[in-house]
């Protein structure tokens, strides 16, 4: 069975949710502690959301120096699929595995809402279950989700197809070019601010209208992200 590591730092909140999403997708979730200098032979890694090390200095800055991250950086350079969600995205940027930075939301408020995203790049290890142009609805919760990069970096990201997810209908945090997630050149490392792990199990996902016209919890739009990496590993 495919084994997917889920990293826990002090202050991580969503590791159990990420592990549950991995298991629903059909893989075995393997806990990786921040002090681990060994990835225990996992086939992919998820860095989940939360407030690692209390968000001191900058969000993700201390986590980027943890022993487990040295191994993740090394193995990602050899092709290991890595997904960073919310705080995990911040950690990937602080580790220079992905470009840009996540800063305070432009309205200076913490967000918690369902968010529509458009898949811009369906050719990464984490998005192959989708088609470019597909829209998905997943929860969003952050205070520092405002993605920014230099004009030259933004032009490169757009020109080389490295924008993976884009906010639809509304830009919730001021991110440049409505960017919600990006990838590296190889397509094995992806980071996004919204939380696909919270939209993987029927009855517990975002609100949607049912056949009776009433609102129901049940969206599973995020499950394809976890199924994508399994397909990438076996394909």
What are these regions (language model features)?
Residues 1-85, 93-99, 103-111, 118, ...:
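N-terminal beta1-alpha1 cap of cysteine-dependent amidohydrolase-like domains
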Residues 2, 133-135, 184-189:
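Beta-strand-turn-beta hairpins that frame and shape the catalytic cleft
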Residues 12-14, 52-54, 124-126, 144-148, ...:
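Short, acidic Gly/Pro/Ser/Thr-rich loop/turn segments
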Residues 88:
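Conserved Rossmann-fold NAD(P)-dependent oxidoreductase catalytic core, especially the SDR/UDP-sugar
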Residues 97-180:
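Pocket-forming structural segment of enzyme catalytic cores
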Residues 142, 179-212:
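A glycine-centered loop/beta-turn motif at secondary-structure junctions
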């Amino acid at each position: 069975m495919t084994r997917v590591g889920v990293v826990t730092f002090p202050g991580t909140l969503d590791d159990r949710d990420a592990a549950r999403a991995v298991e629903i997708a059909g893989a075995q979730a393997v806990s990786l502690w921040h002090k681990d200098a060994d990835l225990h032979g996992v086939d992919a890694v998820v860095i989940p959301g939360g407030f690692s090390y209390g968000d001191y200095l900058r969000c993700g800055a201390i986590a980027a120096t943890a022993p487990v991250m040295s191994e993740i950086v090394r193995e990602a350079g050899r092709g290991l699929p890595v997904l960073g969600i919310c705080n995990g995205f911040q950690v990937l940027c602080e580790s220079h595995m992905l470009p840009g930075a996540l800063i305070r939301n432009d309205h200076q408020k913490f967000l918690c809402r369902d968010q529509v995203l458009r898949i811009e790049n369906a050719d990464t290890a984490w998005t192959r279950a989708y088609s470019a142009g597909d829209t998905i609805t997943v929860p969003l919760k952050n205070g520092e989700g405002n993605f920014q990069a230099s004009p030259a970096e933004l032009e490169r990201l757009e020109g080389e197809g490295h924008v993976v997810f884009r906010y639809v209908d509304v830009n919730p945090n001021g991110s440049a070019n409505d960017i919600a997630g990006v990838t590296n050149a190889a397509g094995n490392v992806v980071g996004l601010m919204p939380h696909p792990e919270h939209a993987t199990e029927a009855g517990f996902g975002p609100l949607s209208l049912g056949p009776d016209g009433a609102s129901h919890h049940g969206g599973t739009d995020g499950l394809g992200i976890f199924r994508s990496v399994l397909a990438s590993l076996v394909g």
